[in-house]
Amino acid sequence: MLALRRYAYVALGVTCAHLVFGAIVRISGSGMGCGDHWPRCYGSFFPPLNRPDLIIEVTHRYLASVLLLALIALLVAAWRRRAAPGVGGSGGVLRSSALAVALGVAAALLGAITVKLGNIPFATLAHWTVAMSLVAVVVATVIRAGGLGGAATRLREVSGRTKRATIAGAAMALLAVVMGGLTAKYPGAAVACPSFPLCGTNPDVQGGAVHIQLTHRWLALFLVLHLFGVVMAQRKRRESPIILRAAAIALSLGVLQLLVAGAMIGMHLPPVLRSLHQATGVSIWIATFALAYLARIAGDGHGVREPQVAPRPTDLVGAGVGGTESREPWRSVALSAATQDDTRPLSTMSHSVAVIVARGADS
């Protein structure tokens, strides 16, 4: 499972790099850097790198190829270990890695369609949404392989209220990120609100672009407030330190995103801050999805657990009470059972039998 976890982490890293670079392609207007040619760039897989937009677009395509290879390698590794616990079957690494490969192929095909359609906004939005789904599946694969706190989270249950709250947070994050992609691509939406946190007015922008920008902002604000509530609730309930840590990370990223957004508007949308804004948005989606998935699997017993070895009867014989050996081994076992604490509960009948045996031995 350790090897699979490493494969999954590599796939996650390549996926994140590919998504961030895809955001740079949109922000820099390099989506048509290779014209309407796909998969080749002006008839060649290795065109002359003589224009910035061509360099950005072809690098994005190279990263897509590396990503597909990483996903296929993860799938092959999972297939070879399909008989291992936590790999095959429902909730296993094999199924999620297969879904990741399918989504990777779908994203590549949507990229081709987007290029052929001239990089229109809604084709780009569909491509971006599939990419968000892909990174979510890769995150789920990492967690199923025991990464990102997945192994330890399964050992502690969380309430249904916590699970519902984390799912709501992930849904809001996905909507905010998708609307952010539409804001970056829809004509005039990125400059529709010249002020922050208030919108202000831009007479050169149509109403539809303003509505897209405001929807993106309100979703981001509601998400941060919701994550703050999740963190406060977890601090009060003390259900799982891993869930609390994941919620705190998501909240911190949300606050950082608001600060980056304010700086970006105040500095009139410099490309560097726009790229950072997109990268932080992807990070928030990853964090909130991981939080929701960790809460979903908490205490369900799926995936990999540390093996629990039951004590042998010979280990109990002669153990005594308080660490001292006893010459009456069955009496020692009975007294030990009668004085069990709450961490190893006995049924009522077995507890009563243990007490009776202990008293009979005394008499």
Where are these regions (language model features)?
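Polytopic transmembrane helical bundles with strong interfacial aromatic enrichment
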Residues: M1-W330, A334-S336, T343, V353-S363
